[in-house]
């Protein structure tokens, strides 16, 4: 094994900085009643305004809040939206996560599927961690420099495999809400 590692240029990571360490925590997110959350990573101060324009023009009836955390300069949480309660909930969520260059959107009267593609196509957006109404935990790493999101726990673990009856129920539901003919 050692020879393989040596031949393939794998080297053990030895950190000369004794202070370097990483703590992991799971932050439980309190999603407002009747809302979906979209949580993602972004990189530029105009994110909040661009995401506002995307949602407002894609789903005009949507109620939403948006917040974005800067990762340099004043490191402020920037917020936009058309519902003050959802804006405040986004700010509270990002304060509890504490990571830079993250955005949070709470969406009501619309589903994430309505806005995800335009959000992913926004030049500032680097990635989407989740789009869900399920119970949510955010896995956060903290170092001396700051915090970052490693991933999310979206909902619960699988309990089984879909049966024919489950499949029929799923298909009926999608037609009932207008997503299939």
Please state what every model-predicted region is.
Residues 20-79, 164-181:
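N-terminal, charge-rich interaction modules
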Residues 4-7:
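Charged/polar low-complexity intrinsically disordered segments
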Residues 10-21:
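Short, Lys/Arg-enriched N-terminal segments with co-localized hydrophobic residues
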Residues 44-46, 71-73, 82-84, 108-113, ...:
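Gly/Ser/Thr-rich loops at beta-strand to alpha-helix junctions
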Residues 93-99, 110-181:
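Helix-rich interaction surfaces within compact, conserved domain-sized segments
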Residues 71-95:
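Positively charged, polar, low-complexity stretches
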Residues 35-38, 62-67, 76, 101-104, ...:
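Structural motif
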């Amino acid at each position: 094994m050692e020879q393989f590692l040596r031949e393939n240029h794998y080297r053990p990571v030895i950190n000369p900085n004794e202070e370097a360490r990483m703590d992991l925590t799971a932050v439980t997110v309190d999603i407002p009643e009747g809302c979906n959350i979209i949580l993602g990573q972004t990189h530029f101060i105009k994110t909040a305004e661009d995401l506002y324009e995307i949602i407002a023009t894609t789903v005009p009836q949507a109620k939403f809040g948006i917040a974005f955390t800067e990762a340099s300069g004043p490191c402020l949480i920037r917020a936009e939206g058309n519902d003050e309660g959802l804006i405040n909930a986004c700010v509270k969520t990002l304060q509890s996560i504490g990571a830079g260059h993250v955005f949070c959107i709470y969406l009501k009267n619309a589903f994430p599927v309505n806005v995800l593609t335009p959000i992913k196509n926004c030049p500032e957006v680097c990635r989407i961690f989740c789009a869900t109404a399920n119970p949510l935990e955010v896995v956060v790493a903290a170092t001396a420099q700051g915090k970052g999101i490693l991933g999310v726990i979206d909902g619960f673990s699988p309990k089984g495999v879909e049966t024919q009856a489950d499949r029929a129920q799923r298909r009926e539901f999608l037609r009932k809400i207008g997503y299939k003919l």
